[in-house]
Every structure is written in structure tokens, then in C-alpha cells.
Amino acid sequence: MFYWVMKRIFLGPVLKLLFRPWVKGLDNIPADGPAIIASNHLSFSDSIFMPLMVRRPVVFLAKSEYFTGTGIKGRLTALFFRLTNQLPMDRSGGAASAASLTAGMEVLLHGGLLGIYPEGTRSPDSRLYRGKVGVARLALQAGVPVIPVAMIGTDKVQPIGKRLPNIRRIGMIFGEPLDFSRYRDQAEDRDIQRKVTDQIMFELMRLSGQEYVDEYAAVVKLRLAGKAVEPAAAAEPLASPAADAGRGETSPGASQGTPQDMRKADDGGAAAAG
């Protein structure tokens, strides 16, 4: 009830008036049934603007720190996330992260829309970073489509560290649903999970126009903060870009570059395979 009232009566109309969001591809969201909405992550405000424009309720996996804040701001943030039915995502790995994904699975099993940020954290510099395989595990185990969505300009509205937002227009592009049902009997195969995740990231790169960086955003943040990076944090192998070239399934690749560069590489790989 609180979610509906805030979205339709109070917060939603005000945000639409101030930020005038433009949207493409909204019809790619199914009218009913479960699906994963996989988004790039530029700003805290992504979790506000994107559900605002989707007609159906979207339950997001949000970092657990949002639910444990202290002080007035921290408590208000925690209250907001709870009242809007968001789920805490423990990003420490292991059993804690697995439990968070189980909660996300429950949303899908009940026919809901689950929002997830494959990068696992906000981009530190507006580029698109390597996706974590949790999104693939959920999609394969639940047998649901993945709808990629590119958030545009939210990093300019509320950059990391900025308390008050800048008033400017933002946008979002919803891509066509990605169907991975052919891999459902291989849901626990790590190589398949990596391959599926890479395809999702490729679509996000294509839709957003962001430069892709083949490294985890969390690792880059640690480095920028001057903290030591554990080798295991960046050791996960990337699926081969040419592995499924004949079927058009392409990894973002093992290097960084523009979406145009990646598409050229994709075309070349497909031609070689033929």
C-alpha cells in the first residue's frame, strides 16, 4: 500500500515533474509473470527512478548497508527501503550472498519483477563494469527472461558523495527480453553462468553507450580508496567471446573500449566462425 501511494500520489508525480524522465522500450516489460530487470548502476537514485516508470511493482536487491544505517539519514533510508519492499543483498559472498539470492528467487516464484544490478555496486566513474554471475544463476534456476535496462544520466543527477540531487532530465532504455531457457539444465555450470552474465552486460553496454571495463567495480573502488585487493576478487575467468559466435552470444570481451569497438569485434568473430 505504501509503495502504491508513494509511486502514484506523492513522490512519483513530484519526481516526474522535476526530472522529466524519458523512456524507451517500456513495452518490453511483460504485463504479468516473473522476470528479472537487470540494470547498469550509476547512482543511488536508479532504484527510485526506474521502478517509478514501470507500471508493475519492482522489488530490488539493494545492498544491505541501506538497511542498517545509523543517524537520522540512515534510519530514514532504511525505513524507505523496507516500506517499498526492497530486499537486503549481502555482498560479502558465501552463504550470506546465497541467502540474499534465495530471497530474490522467492520474488520470481511468486510471479514478481526482480530488479538487480549485475555490477554489484555503483560505477565509480560512469563506465560499465564486469557483471557478477548471481543474475545468471537466478535467471537460469527460475527459468525467467532477463530484461536489460540502461539508466541514462542518473550519475549527473546524484553523483557519488553528493547529498542533494541536481535537477536535470534523466532517461532509461528497456531492451528486449533475453531468453536463456536453453541453458536451464546447466544452471549450476559456472562457465554457462559466466556466459549468460556476459551477454547481459553486452546488452547493457549496447543500450547505454557506456565504455566497458573488464574488471569488477568493487575492485576498482578498493584500489581508488588505497586498499589492498585480494587476488581472488578479480580472478574469475571470463567466458570466451567466440564461444557462441554462431548463435550471436557475445561476451563484452577481455578488454575495455566503446560499444562500437565491441560490436566490430563481435561481427568479426561471427564472420570467422562462419
Features from the language model and the residues they span:
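Secondary-structure boundary/capping positions in well-ordered alpha/beta enzyme cores
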Residues: P21, R56-P57, L87, G111, ...
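Short, basic, glycine/proline-bearing loop/turn elements
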Residues: F10-G12, L83-R91, P118-R122
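Non-catalytic C-terminal accessory region of glycerolipid acyltransferases
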Residues: F2, A98-G274
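Catalytic core of membrane glycerolipid acyltransferases/transacylases, capturing the structured
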Residues: K16, I29-G94
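Short gly/ser/thr-rich secondary-structure transition/capping motifs
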Residues: K16-V23, A96-A98, D155
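Alpha-helical membrane-targeting segments
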Residues: M1-R20, T70-N85, R163-R169
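A generic local structural motif
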Residues: I9, P21-L26, D46-S47, G74, ...
